[in-house]
């Protein structure tokens, strides 16, 4: 798929589908659309007058041009209220209309910036259109073998009409950024959607190697023997029951000043989580192939960072393994010793992600990370608390939280900080070890996050629980069913915000 900014009259475009954006409560078309509507015999204005099309956000209506203009078809696209229309609204409506266009098997599409460059920068407009298009059209279907999927026509070209003078370069810059961020997000989506028999820890390491080679990132892959030497008792406890060897991946991007801040990104990579000895119910266990959403987000972020090259330093640490029951598996009642030296009483083997994370956090600090973000599909409690639209944050540093919140706003992703009062830390203290790996049935998302925070060694740290946002069971805007690639763009924006 190619994007191209062009200076052309809307009524002269010879494309399969022309997308015309209309705000809610608009009673008459602007000059650009009015000329074309005249060629269509006033059909669009007539439908607006009859309230057959109201311009509500995401509303679409297909119009056949019947040869009156070069474009074969038009799709009227509702933009909602003008004063409320922001970048994420644009990203979402573009995704929706592109899916509608796909149903018509369109190969060429033209879209206007809808005049919104007046209150959104041209660069952000181009970025949102590119992201909305690519993310909205994303499909994970390469395991399908039927002729229908093989024969489906693919969108080839998207033309963005430049309605104003002097903004072509800004639109193109935004498009280039949006394409790279969308590609990185789709890498994360693919990782989450892959079946567990394909995406083993070994395969994840190969994907990490591909990203590092593409962008010239430093790469280190630690094997089980390396983890034993480093004293990663918590990580090794989780992986003990599996026949698949664990992998710990380290990717380094050096784009900032030598001796400057180093952003540490840590991802939980459980390529399959059965729950171990504390085994999960059979219903829904298939979704546990996606318990590596944190690792997917980190690897996707490193793809974005490698492609867009912000002027900052980043270390990514990804711990990949399986959690399986066997005669060698770790058990409730065991006590494990972490790389950081703290001992952990195991009360439930299905609270394993935090055990992988703490050893990875300790290693990131050993490698020089000065600020930390860990990401994980960690708790069902987070899903209960915040649902499927919002990622939970737990932190030890309010300024660092604010920086991540700002990054998430720039990315169009929702986050919400949960409390971290001292009383919650009391819930994870053990009577026979330093810590226990669950804190009881209350405040589960908070206590799980604070467990990881015990290993941050006082460095600014934020835990992102993406249990509710890593996968979606329906299409909504640029989010498609399956893996969402959540946090990839937020992490890139965070890295960019650290530029000096």
Swiss-Prot record:
Annotated EC: 3.4.11.1, 3.4.11.10
Subcellular localization: Cytoplasm
Species per Swiss-Prot/TrEMBL record: Alkaliphilus metalliredigens (strain QYMF)
Cysteine pairings via disulfide bonds: none
Family according to the record: Belongs to the peptidase M17 family.
One CC-aspect GO term: cytoplasm
Protein name stated in the entry: Probable cytosol aminopeptidase
Reactions this protein catalyses: Release of an N-terminal amino acid, Xaa-|-Yaa-, in which Xaa is preferably Leu, but may be other amino acids including Pro although not Arg or Lys, and Yaa may be Pro. Amino acid amides and methyl esters are also readily hydrolyzed, but rates on arylamides are exceedingly low; Release of an N-terminal amino acid, preferentially leucine, but not glutamic or aspartic acids
Designated gene of the protein: pepA
């Amino acid at each position: 798929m190619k994007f191209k900014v062009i200076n052309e009259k809307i009524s002269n475009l010879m494309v399969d589908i022309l997308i015309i954006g209309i705000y809610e409560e608009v009673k008459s078309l602007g000059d650009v659309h009015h000329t074309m509507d005249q060629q269509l015999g006033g059909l669009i204005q007539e439908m607006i007058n009859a309230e057959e099309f109201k311009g509500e956000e995401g509303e679409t209506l297909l119009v056949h041009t019947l040869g009156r203009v070069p474009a074969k078809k038009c799709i009227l696209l509702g933009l909602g209220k003008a004063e409320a229309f922001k970048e994420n609204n644009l990203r979402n409506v573009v995704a929706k209309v592109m899916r509608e266009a796909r149903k018509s098997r369109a190969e060429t599409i033209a879209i206007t910036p809808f005049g919104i460059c007046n209150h959104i920068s041209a660069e952000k407009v181009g970025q949102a259109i590119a992201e909305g298009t690519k993310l909205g059209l994303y499909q994970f279907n390469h395991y399908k073998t039927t002729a229908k999927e093989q024969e489906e026509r693919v969108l080839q070209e998207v033309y963005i009409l430049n309605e104003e003078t002097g903004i072509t370069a800004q639109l193109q810059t935004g498009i280039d950024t949006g394409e790279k961020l969308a590609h990185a997000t789709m890498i994360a989506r693919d990782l989450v959607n892959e079946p567990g028999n394909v995406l083993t820890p070994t395969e994840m390491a190969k994907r990490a190697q591909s990203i590092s080679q593409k962008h010239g990132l430093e790469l280190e892959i630690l094997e089980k023997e390396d983890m034993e030497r480093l004293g990663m008792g918590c990580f090794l406890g989780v992986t003990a029951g599996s026949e698949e060897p664990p992998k710990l991946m380290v990717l380094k991007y050096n784009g900032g000043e030598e001796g400057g801040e180093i952003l540490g990104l840590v991802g939980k990579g459980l390529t399959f989580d059965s729950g171990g000895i504390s085994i999960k119910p059979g219903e829904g266990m298939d979704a546990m192939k996606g318990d590596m959403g944190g690792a997917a987000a980190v690897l996707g972020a490193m793809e974005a960072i490698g492609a867009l090259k912000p002027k900052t330093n980043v270390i990514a640490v990804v711990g990949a393994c399986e959690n399986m029951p066997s005669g060698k598996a770790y058990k409730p009642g065991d006590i494990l010793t972490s790389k950081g030296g703290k001992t952990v009483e195991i009360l439930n083997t299905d609270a394993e992600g935090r055990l992988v994370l703490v050893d990875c956090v300790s290693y990131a600090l050993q490698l020089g990370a000065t600020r930390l973000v860990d990401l994980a599909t960690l708790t069902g409690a987070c899903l209960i608390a915040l649902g499927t639209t919002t990622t939970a944050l737990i932190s030890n540093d309010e300024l660092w939280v604010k920086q991540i919140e700002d990054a998430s706003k720039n990315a169009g992703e929702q986050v919400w900080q949960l409390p971290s009062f001292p009383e919650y830390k009391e819930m994870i203290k053990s009577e026979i070890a330093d810590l226990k790996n669950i804190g009881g049935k209350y405040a589960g998302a908070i206590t799980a996050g604070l467990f990881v925070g015990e290993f941050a060694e006082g460095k600014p740290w934020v835990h992102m629980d993406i249990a509710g946002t890593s996968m979606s069971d329906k299409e909504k805007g640029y989010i498609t069913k399956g893996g969402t690639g959540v946090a990839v763009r937020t992490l890139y924006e965070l890295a960019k915000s650290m530029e000096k």
